[in-house]
Design a protein with these regions (language model features):
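Glycine-rich phosphate/diphosphate-binding loop of Rossmann-like nucleotide-binding domains
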Residues: 191, 196-300
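Conserved active-site and cofactor/substrate-binding residues in soluble primary-metabolism enzymes
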Residues: 20, 24-27, 93-96, 130-141, ...
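Rossmann-like adenosine-cofactor binding region
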Residues: 259-349
Length: 430
């Protein structure tokens, strides 16, 4: 039976009650719809990905067997420009997760006003169980499979969980071999020698630090002496922790996959970073006391930075949080239920879609540099990153004040209006 005129037939996996990250995203869009004015008539376009590609990724293993892995590339919204978003290799990757991450990339790119739409990719695999040659074959096969929808003017992948500059180099080379010409701009996060940008590795953490300082300034919190707790101590959490420590804050607790550590007087961050580099995690660091993982969330601190995976702050642990401010370095680390709890507690949440946009901002710089074949100094890159992040945060802060809403809702209002205005101006074709 056909749907009545004016209604939308919604596939089951797009239902707002859908469990998982995509359901979280749909709830977030529903929260901002009342603030969109006449643009709300287009809001349904934000609740559906433009396209979702599921691919089989078969590779020959080192022992001669053939293994099959499931891969994804989702393009959520391309109204403002080509798709942009990372590729993650993780055993728990799902379509719901990749769809949500692509949508959050749409929001993030629009929030900082870089000319991209949102996209995301992933392979359901534990890369730690692969040899280097198996990882390379997996990357190249996946790149070939999604090659029909990526390109420097179509969709530009980047590193994410368990992917790095080497993986991006393999992706760039595979795409280039397939099209018959070197195309450095097809991915970002590449090695500098292959058209990568200076400052890219630290960019997300630097963005977290920048908006954190702006939020602290606007709320009257002094960074000097502030106690900081960080979950995840890789490129994002490690860089943010280092910059906060250099600004006079005390990093008092850190958690990662190897355990949780605490030192109320402040951790020696350079020594901890060296320990992580040598051992692969914070566990066993001599300059701190070990603590139970569930105790990490209740540690006495002023600023909490979740910089690991999504859905880490939930209704089960949000009530324990003592921080005055949460700066989301990870994508989607706070569930909607936890968001409400933190709001009721008076905790300021600086959301992922603005806080961790430093990475995609410098990816944009890399893309621009690749097209022009003219490269900037690290000082130029960092200065431009800080300017864009400060301007974007100031705009979001003003919308939050004007509408008396959270920073997350304000970021979504800014981003959704930009995307839907672009969609309205472009119209529908045919």
């Amino acid at each position: 039976m056909a749907s009545p005129a004016g209604t939308h037939s919604l596939p089951s996996y797009l239902d707002p009650n859908h469990l998982g990250p995509w359901g979280v995203y749909l709830q977030q869009v529903d929260r901002v719809t009342p603030y969109l004015g006449s643009l709300a008539r287009w809001v349904e376009t934000l609740k559906r990905p433009k396209r979702a590609l599921i691919v089989d990724v078969p590779i020959e293993m080192d022992n001669g067997t053939i293994a099959h892995f499931e891969g994804y590339r989702v393009q959520h919204n391309l109204s403002r420009g080509p798709g942009k978003g990372g590729v993650r290799f993780h055993q728990d990757v799902t379509l719901s997760e990749v769809m949500a991450l692509s949508a959050w990339m749409s929001i993030k790119n629009a929030a900082v006003n870089v000319p991209y739409g949102g996209a995301k990719g992933g392979i359901r695999v534990d890369p730690k169980k692969l040899s280097r040659s198996e990882l390379e074959r997996l990357t190249r096969r996946y790149t070939s499979e999604i090659g029909i929808i990526i390109g420097p003017s179509k969709d530009i992948p980047a590193p994410d969980v368990n992917t790095n500059a080497q993986v991006m180099a393999w992706m760039m080379d595979t795409y280039s071999q397939n099209v018959g010409a070197t195309s450095t701009g097809v991915v970002t996060g590449k090695p500098v020698d292959l058209g990568g940008s200076l400052g890219r590795v630290e960019a997300t953490g630097r963005g977290v630090f920048t908006v954190g300082c702006e939020a602290a300034r606007l709320t009257g919190m002094a960074i000097e002496g502030a106690r900081v707790a960080v979950q995840g101590f890789g490129n994002v959490g490690g860089t943010a922790g280092k910059l906060f420590a250099e600004a006079g804050a005390k990093v008092v607790a850190v958690q990662d996959h190897t355990g949780s550590i605490h030192n109320a007087k402040g951790l020696d961050v350079p020594a901890l970073l060296a320990h992580v580099q040598q051992t692969g995690g914070v566990g066993g660091f001599a300059g701190a006391d070990a603590m139970a993982n569930d105790e990490f969330w209740g540690v006495a601190c002023d600023i909490l930075i979740p910089a690991a995976l999504e859905s880490q702050i939930t209704q089960d642990n949000a009530g324990k949080i003592q921080a005055k401010m949460v700066i989301e370095g990870a994508n989607g680390p706070t569930t909607p239920e936890a968001d409400d709890i933190l709001h009721d507690k008076g905790v300021l949440v600086v959301p992922d879609v603005i806080a961790n946009a430093g990475g995609v901002t410098v990816s944009y710089f890399e893309w621009v540099q690749d097209f022009s074949s003219f490269f900037w100094t690290e000082e130029e890159i960092n200065a431009r990153l800080v300017r864009i992040m400060k301007e974007a945060f100031a705009g979001v802060w003003q919308v939050a004040q004007d509408n008396k809403v959270s920073l997350r809702t304000a970021t979504f209002i800014v981003a959704c209006k930009r995307m839907l205005h672009a969609r309205e101006m472009r119209g529908l074709y045919p």
